[in-house]
């Protein structure tokens, strides 16, 4: 309590444990969606999955222990979409070159953060725009959730009714002010899914073999970023990193010292993400 100031912040160990469980299960979708998105850019799924798990653990622990803020971190889907569909799919970079762009962009973000430029940038943005950025990120996550629940499929059979039941359970439990409404809903929907389906298919991929060749598979490249397309990609990536960080940190962190440390963690973990073969880690909530 002396370090984390739980009493001062109006919370308790029990509340934090429950909140941690809810946050974990509500964010775990990233373990399934993120590798699939990166695989469309050519990144081996086992590689991106291992990188996602490692970065999520290290980044979230650093955010809590160093910045003392209750923000979970993992590779963000917005950054992943830019990586897979713009850098690779649109501009024609290989995924190895895109990792190089990720690292360089993140290093620039680190420089802006530790020199105080990001703070000046924050002060220049109107409060309404900060709120709009946060809302936009939230709506993007809602869209992803609806897609994964099957609500946005145009045709074909899907399990959208399970997602609808889950949403209904959350609404009812929240209405009656039941603690852990999200956690209860997630547990119930998971049970229903396993009862009415055969569960998840087990991949036959030799993960240990791919793990032993991890850094050989990465083969990060920096050569093509000195050309105009590379410079444009780096500039765009830096802007995305800044606005993603601003949108979440400004919404959830009021203390300026904690916010400053949060930006530092986000910037450093973005670099680490690229080094280990995934798109930048961002604050999810």
What are these regions (language model features)?
Residues 59-72, 172-177, 236-237, 268-278:
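Transmembrane alpha-helix interface/packing and boundary motifs in multi-pass membrane proteins
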Residues 9, 38-54, 235-285:
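Membrane-embedded helical hairpins/re-entrant loop segments and their flanking transmembrane helices
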Residues 47, 67-79, 125-129, 178, ...:
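Short, non-helical or kinked segments that cap or interrupt transmembrane helices
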Residues 63-101:
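Membrane-interface helix-loop-helix modules in multi-pass membrane proteins
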Residues 22-26, 159-167, 179-185, 211-249:
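Hydrophobic, membrane-embedded alpha-helices of multi-pass small-molecule transporters
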Residues 1-68, 86-88:
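N-terminal signal-anchor module of multipass membrane proteins
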Residues 91-196:
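Membrane-embedded alpha-helical modules
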Residues 27, 79-87, 130-143, 187-201, ...:
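Small-residue-rich segments of transmembrane alpha-helices in multi-pass membrane proteins
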């Amino acid at each position: 309590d002396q370090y984390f100031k739980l009493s001062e912040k109006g919370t308790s160990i029990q509340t934090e444990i429950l909140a941690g469980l809810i946050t974990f299960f509500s964010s775990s979708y990233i373990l399934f969606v993120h590798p699939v998105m990166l695989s469309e850019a050519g990144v081996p799924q086992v590689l991106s999955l291992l990188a996602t798990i490692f970065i999520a653990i290290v980044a979230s622990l650093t955010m809590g222990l160093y910045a003392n803020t209750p923000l979970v971190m993992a590779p963000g889907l917005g950054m992943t979409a830019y990586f897979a569909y713009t850098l690779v799919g649109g501009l024609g970079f290989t995924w190895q070159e895109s990792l190089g762009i990720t690292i360089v962009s993140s290093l620039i973000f680190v420089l802006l953060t530790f020199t105080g430029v990001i703070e000046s940038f924050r002060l220049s943005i109107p409060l309404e725009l900060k709120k709009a950025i946060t809302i936009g990120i939230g709506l993007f996550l809602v869209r992803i959730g609806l897609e994964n629940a099957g609500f946005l499929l145009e045709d074909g059979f899907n399990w959208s009714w399970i997602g609808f039941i889950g949403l209904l359970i959350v609404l009812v439990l929240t209405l009656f002010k039941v603690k852990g409404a999200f956690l209860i809903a997630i547990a119930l929907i998971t049970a229903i899914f396993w009862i009415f389906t055969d569960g998840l298919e087990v991949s036959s991929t030799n993960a240990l073999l791919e793990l032993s060749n991890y850094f050989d598979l990465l083969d990060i490249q920096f050569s093509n970023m000195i050309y105009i397309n590379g410079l444009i990609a780096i500039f765009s990536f830096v802007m995305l990193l800044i606005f993603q960080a601003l949108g979440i940190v400004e919404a959830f962190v009021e203390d300026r010292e904690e916010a400053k440390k949060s930006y530092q963690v986000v910037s450093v973990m973005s670099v680490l993400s690229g080094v280990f073969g995934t798109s930048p880690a961002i604050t999810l909530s």
